[in-house]
Every structure is written in C-alpha cells, then in structure tokens.
C-alpha cells in the first residue's frame, strides 16, 4: 500500500494515519525532490534562516580511507568547491581571500619567512600562498592525501601543484604525531588550517605545547578559527587557547562570499 503526500502537509501525519488504520509489519518512508534544481543545504544556516547552494554538477562524492566524506561540487554562483563532511571548505571563486588573509595575518606580526609549517589545508591554498610569498621551506602536514589528490584534479588553480614544488615537503598522517620528531625552534610561521569545531579546538589545545616548542622565538602561529558572526563562542574558545599559551592574540577578518559570512584568523607571537 502506497501513501503519497506533498505540499505543506507533514509526512509524519501520513505515517500516523497508516500506523493507526492499517495493519502492517513494517513501514518505509521515502522522500524525493521534484524540483529541477539541485540544492545543497548550508551547515551554517540558522533556525530562522535556511540557506542552500545551487549545484550544477556533482564531480566527486566518496568517503576517503581516513573516513572523511569528500565532495567536489560545481556551484552555480561560486564555481567548483570542496565539501568535507557536508561543510564547504573552499570555493575556487574566492579562495584567494581566505588564503591570502590567513598567511598575511601571520606575516603582519613577523615578516620572517625562512621556514613555515602548515597543519591541514588539504586544498593547497595556504601552501600556494606561502610559495607565492617566497617562503624558503614549507613543511606541509596533512592527514588525508585523498583530499590533496582530488583538489589537484578538480581545483588545480587553488593548489597549483604545490606538492610538486621543491620548497614543499609533504608529511602524511597525524600532524601532531609527526611534529614530535621536529627539532625545537624550527619555524618562523605555523599555519593551523584545521576544522573550526570543538574537537579540533580541544586537539590543538592538547598539543599546543608541542607547537610552541617547534616555533622560533618571535615566531608566529596563526589558525583559522571560524566565524565570529556565526559562532562567537567557538571563536572565543580558540582565542582562549592562544591567550593561555602565548599571552597574546590578534584577530584578522575577511568576508568570504561562498561562506556568506566574515571569517576570522587568530595570530599569536611567541615571546
């Protein structure tokens, strides 16, 4: 027996009627979108404002070996974009705003750029920006090589094959395990490009002593900390981590159209 509902009537009403009026062994609920336009829900939507991206084409859609759900979508307004675990990471139309603000936030506090470390940043934008800023050497610690590969394939303008540059050394796997073997006072700049959720905040806080150890005196650590407009408590949590470990932090801000909000970067100098 099939029961079809549409419009503003809640499917739960139909389910209740079926359960009460018809003897059954099981019920299967299916939903489909009759629209000709594919929409992708924006995780940063609020209860009072539901937003979605218009998708022209799905270019990639898979789960990586390390467990991340990776998608490359061709968006109507922003071009090709990387989504990880259902959240936009970068879009080719405005990635330069993100990466340039990220790197320059650190350089404002200390212009030295002999050697940098990048933690995360699988799309390659931060690595490309460091190369364009003429950093001498760049150690890029990335958990998931499949993110890098799929971005090289579909978003090559962002990374510009950064992994193939002589100045870049890629270290695959858990970054915080890998940096245990790095010598003290190695880096002028450290860029932490992890997710801005509480898990990554706690992870960074747990390993901050190691990050301080490998940062040169007067060196700078910069992290992307999310949107102060959308998630102020989350940004405050990041700032607390930096203030507790460095006694200082400076917040930078740039509007990212594909994120539909201003994004923040926190930088601290190692006094």
Q: What residue spans do the PLM features occupy?
A:
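Non-catalytic substrate-recognition/targeting regions of SAM-dependent transferases
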Residues: 2, 20-84
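The AdoMet/dcAdoMet-binding core of the Class I SAM-like
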Residues: 3-42, 90-245, 259-261
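Active-site lining segments that contact anionic ligands and/or coordinate catalytic metals
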Residues: 67, 79, 218, 262-263
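Residues at the C-termini of beta-strands that transition into short coil/loop
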Residues: 76, 174, 253
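Short, glycine-/Ser/Thr-/acidic-enriched flexible segments
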Residues: 77, 228, 256
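Core SAM-dependent methyltransferase catalytic element
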Residues: 245, 255-271
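Short beta-strand elements
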Residues: 249-250
């Amino acid at each position: 027996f099939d029961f079809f509902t549409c419009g503003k009537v809640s499917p739960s009403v139909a389910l209740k009627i079926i359960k009460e009026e018809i003897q059954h062994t099981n019920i299967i609920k299916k939903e489909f979108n009759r629209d000709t336009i594919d929409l992708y829900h924006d995780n940063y939507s609020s209860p009072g404002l539901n937003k979605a991206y218009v998708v022209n084409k799905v270019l990639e859609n898979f789960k990586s070996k390390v467990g991340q759900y990776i998608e490359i979508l061709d968006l109507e307004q922003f071009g090709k974009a990387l989504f990880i675990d259902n959240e936009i990471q970068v879009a080719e139309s405005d990635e330069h705003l993100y990466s340039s603000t990220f790197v320059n936030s650190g350089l404002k506090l200390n212009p030295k750029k002999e050697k940098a470390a990048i933690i995360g940043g699988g799309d390659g934008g931060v690595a490309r920006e460091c190369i364009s800023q003429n950093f001498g050497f760049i150690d890029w610690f990335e958990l998931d090589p499949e993110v890098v590969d799929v971005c090289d394939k579909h978003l090559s303008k962002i990374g510009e094959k950064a992994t193939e540059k002589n100045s870049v050394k890629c270290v695959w796997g858990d970054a915080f395990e890998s940096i245990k073997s790095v010598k003290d006072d190695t880096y002028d700049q450290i860029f932490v490009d992890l997710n801005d959720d509480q898990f990554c905040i706690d992870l960074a806080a747990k390993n901050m002593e190691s990050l301080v150890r490998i940062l040169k005196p007067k060196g700078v650590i910069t992290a992307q900390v999310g949107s102060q407009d959308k998630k102020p408590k989350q940004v405050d949590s990041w700032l607390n981590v930096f203030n507790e470990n460095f006694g200082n932090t400076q917040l930078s801000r740039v509007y990212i159209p594909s994120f539909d909000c201003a994004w923040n970067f926190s930088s601290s100098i190692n006094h």
